[in-house]
């Protein structure tokens, strides 16, 4: 990890995606900065915030890959969470002050009751964003108001719960907890979901633990920890990066010959016998390289986000042989 002396390192152009298993107690930005330091990268960005309380899948983008980070922000996410019934807190999670404690009636956690609440919160739902969140109001994050003791009116937001499973687990001796397995759209707050589930059960609840197990088809089994990344020799760390196109697996793939690739990189539309498609990953044939993303309408391929010629050259020049970083390859 970066030493306390903040030793200056020589930065370099790095292009790719690090599939990180974010550790507990670090913010997403802290995890990003540690990985950026370990890779000596010039430019980096993450693909969606995980609270310090949360662990799990956090794709980190470097260099040219940052141009496609929004695609992961918009992707569905899967989580495993633990909610403790009978206790509500000021933040909706274990870090807040206890607001209320109540005895939990076993009937409130009966299988048929859990099934009914599970159905209630599956599909399109409405959520009130928590005050302790990074959502902005008048240019300031809501949590800055909350820390000052100010509660603001917030508009409810529409989100989609694609899949939800509720079950009971033993969290501690003589303490029953609710395990929440959920796949949801962007913008869904799992803390709020845990609170709302507790309210629907009639006993209240707060979020005790949270782990993201999938982000846009990237599973936790493919991720690497910061500790394992740091343990690798510096020369081998770059081999743990996925190429920028790893963020584009759901895009239609189109490959252009050299002439059309050059024109596309200049921002010119190209015509071909392609079906309409809202999201297209565009590659050059010679040399084989990602050019950018676009969309197809009426047989016309239109550029949306392009790599620069320098970025493409750097990616081609630095492509290392993939090494065993302790993660599973996608097949």
Curated annotation (Swiss-Prot):
The encoding gene: truB
Catalytic activity: uridine(55) in tRNA = pseudouridine(55) in tRNA
Keywords: Isomerase, tRNA processing
PANTHER family the record matches: PSEUDOURIDYLATE SYNTHASE TRUB1, TRNA-PSEUDOURIDINE SYNTHASE
Gene Ontology biological process: mRNA pseudouridine synthesis; tRNA pseudouridine synthesis
Protein name listed in UniProt: tRNA pseudouridine synthase B
GO molecular function: RNA binding; tRNA pseudouridine(55) synthase activity
Entries under HAMAP family matching the protein: TruB_bact
Residues of the active site: 51
């Amino acid at each position: 990890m970066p030493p306390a002396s903040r030793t200056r390192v020589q930065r370099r152009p790095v292009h790719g995606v690090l599939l990180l298993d974010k550790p507990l107690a670090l913010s997403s930005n802290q995890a990003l900065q540690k990985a950026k330091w370990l890779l000596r990268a010039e430019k980096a960005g993450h693909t969606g915030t995980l609270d310090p309380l949360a662990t799990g899948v956090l794709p980190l983008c470097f260099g040219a890959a940052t141009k496609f980070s929004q695609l992961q922000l918009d992707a569905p996410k899967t989580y495993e969470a633990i909610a403790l019934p009978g206790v509500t807190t000021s933040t909706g999670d274990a870090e807040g002050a206890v607001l209320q404690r109540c005895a939990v009636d076993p009937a409130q956690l009966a299988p048929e009751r859990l099934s009914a609440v599970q159905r209630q919160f599956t599909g399109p739902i409405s959520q009130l964003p928590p005050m302790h969140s990074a959502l902005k109001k008048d240019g300031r994050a809501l949590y800055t108001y909350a820390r000052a003791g100010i509660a603001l009116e917030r508009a409810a937001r529409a989100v989609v719960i694609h899949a939800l499973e509720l079950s009971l687990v033993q969290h501690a001796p003589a303490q029953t907890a609710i395990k929440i397995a959920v796949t949801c759209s962007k913008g869904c707050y799992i803390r709020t979901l845990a609170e709302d589930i507790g309210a629907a059960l009639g006993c209240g609840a707060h979020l005790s633990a949270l782990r993201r197990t999938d982000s846009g088809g990237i599973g936790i089994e493919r991720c690497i920890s910061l500790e394992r990344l740091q343990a690798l020799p510096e020369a081998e760390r770059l081999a743990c990066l996925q190429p920028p196109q790893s963020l584009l697996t759901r895009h239609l793939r189109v490959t252009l010959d050299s002439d059309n690739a050059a024109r596309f990189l200049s921002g010119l539309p190209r015509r071909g016998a392609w079906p309409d498609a809202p999201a297209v990953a565009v590659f050059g044939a010679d040399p084989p390289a990602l050019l950018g993303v676009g969309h197809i309408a009426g047989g016309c391929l239109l550029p949306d986000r392009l790599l620069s010629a320098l970025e493409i050259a750097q990616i081609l020049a630095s492509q290392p042989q993939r090494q065993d970083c302790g993660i599973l390859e996608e097949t």
